[in-house]
Amino acid sequence: MRQILHIQGGQCGNQIGAKFWEVVCAEHGIDPTGRYTGDSDLQLERIDVYYNEASGGRFVPRAVLMDLEPGTMDSIRSGPYGQIFRPDNFVFGQSGAGNNWAKGHYTEGAELIDSVLDVVRKEAENCDCLQGFQVCHSLGGGTGSGMGTLLISKIREEYPDRMMLTFSVFPSPKVSDTVVEPYNATLSVHQLVENADEVMVLDNEALYDICFRILKLSNPSFGDLNHLISATMSGVTCCLRFPGQLNSDLRKLAVNLIPFPRLHFFMVGFAPLTSRGSQQYRTLSVPELTQQMWDAKNMMCAADPRHGRYLTASAMFRGKMSTKEVDEQMMNVQNKNSSYFVEWIPNNVKSTVCDIPPTGLKMASTFIGNSTSIQEMFRRVSEQFTAMFRRKAFLHWYTGEGMDEMEFTEAESNMNDLVAEYQQYQDATADEDEYGEEEGDEEEYGQHDI
């Protein structure tokens, strides 16, 4: 069995993580005390992907919870599933990172990191075949971004051949939490480009939009947003946890989605999204799921896939459905919208089918796309970063923790390179020569004629 070790860091990561465990517990029939109360052998068959069976038949999540202040941890402990986690796996400091990446990465976080790594090692040794790590964090704050990326790079050193999947909440364009978000996010992306294998890009604004527009919630709470994220997270790994006709795992996902190693930032979507009141009036069909899943409004990050092209994509369907129909629908999407897919990667959409639907639904699907339009997110953060960095605004908070301005410059140029790479492959065509110079030459001639 292939285990996944779940790590959540910072306030955002811990809140998303707590919601995620509620969803996974419900799917596997685990009650808040860790006892199995389900009704199907399938729930237990591969339960050890996310759970460790302790003495007395209790199931304990393979989760490591870290934060630099005790607040969020305390509320998880007193929450509905607080008693299910192993008490030693709560690792927290007292001081907080104060939304400062440098505190999370170099000073406060660095002091706590060894005790986190001890817990990670202990959990990893409990696995007979560790497939990889999934990390939940945000990039705008101090702990999730600074300490989260520190942990990712340390795990990278120690387990170089395991998959590293992150669910990263990017700062949103309109919903801003702190003024130094662009700094924290840019410094984090700099790390994620190098050390993560797969990054699922989420952002609050897109999630708010889904809540307003599709779920018809008048004032959505973070709980609602986290519920959306956790549905997607559970969808990404359902193939590992339940039998299916076409299975995939984290590594297969990476091989199918990443054409170039640096371009591993994915947009995710989930279907069916229906408002709470209208669920009983909807019938679900594969065409309907497919249509909603590919809908640009369904993406959980504020980048519009219609502004770019898909390099690759993967769809994970859950429920009893005909594989033939799934394949037909996916082909249908590609044929109708062929201009939104790069033509130099043939068959670039992969689908997997898992037989067990999420709790309370007949069928569902999770979408993961590697689209060049994700550069919109990076470009936006980069512009905000440059605006502040040019004036060296707020920089003393970071240099005071021992950081060098050089690091900022490096992170900035790395992010701009990433944007340029996405743009390059968006513009590339199948028939141009190796260096892609033809296009440019033709344009120049065109201009002279005028």
Curated annotation (Swiss-Prot):
Q: Where is the composition biased (Acidic residues)?
A: 429-444
A Gene Ontology BP annotation from the UniProt entry: microtubule-based process
Region feature (Disordered): 426-450
Disulfide bridge partners, by residue number: none
Keywords (alphabetical) are:
Cytoplasm, Cytoskeleton, GTP-binding, Magnesium, Metal-binding, Microtubule, Nucleotide-binding
Residues bound to GTP are Q11, E69, S138, G142, T143, G144, N204, N226
Q: Name one GO molecular function term.
A: GTP binding
Domain of life, per the record?
Answer: Eukaryota
Positions that bind Mg(2+):
E69
Location of this chain's protein in the cell:
Cytoplasm, Cytoskeleton
Note the InterPro entries from the entry. Answer: Beta_tubulin (IPR002453), Tub_FtsZ_C (IPR008280), Tubulin (IPR000217), Tubulin/FtsZ-like_C (IPR037103), Tubulin/FtsZ_2-layer-sand-dom (IPR018316), Tubulin/FtsZ_GTPase_sf (IPR036525), Tubulin_C (IPR023123), Tubulin_CS (IPR017975)
Q: What is its main location?
A: cytoplasm
Q: What do the Gene Ontology cellular component annotations say? A: cytoplasm; microtubule
Q: Which cofactor does it need?
A: Mg(2+)
* Subunit structure as annotated in this protein's UniProt entry: Dimer of alpha and beta chains. A typical microtubule is a hollow water-filled tube with an outer diameter of 25 nm and an inner diameter of 15 nM. Alpha-beta heterodimers associate head-to-tail to form protofilaments running lengthwise along the microtubule wall with the beta-tubulin subunit facing the microtubule plus end conferring a structural polarity. Microtubules usually have 13 protofilaments but different protofilament numbers can be found in some organisms and specialized cells.
Q: Which PANTHER family did the record assign?
A: TUBULIN
Q: What does this protein do?
A: Tubulin is the major constituent of microtubules, a cylinder consisting of laterally associated linear protofilaments composed of alpha- and beta-tubulin heterodimers. Microtubules grow by the addition of GTP-tubulin dimers to the microtubule end, where a stabilizing cap forms. Below the cap, tubulin dimers are in GDP-bound state, owing to GTPase activity of alpha-tubulin.
**Protein family according to the UniProt entry:** Belongs to the tubulin family.
In Swiss-Prot or TrEMBL terms, this protein is called Tubulin beta-1 chain
Gene name for this UniProt entry: TUBB1
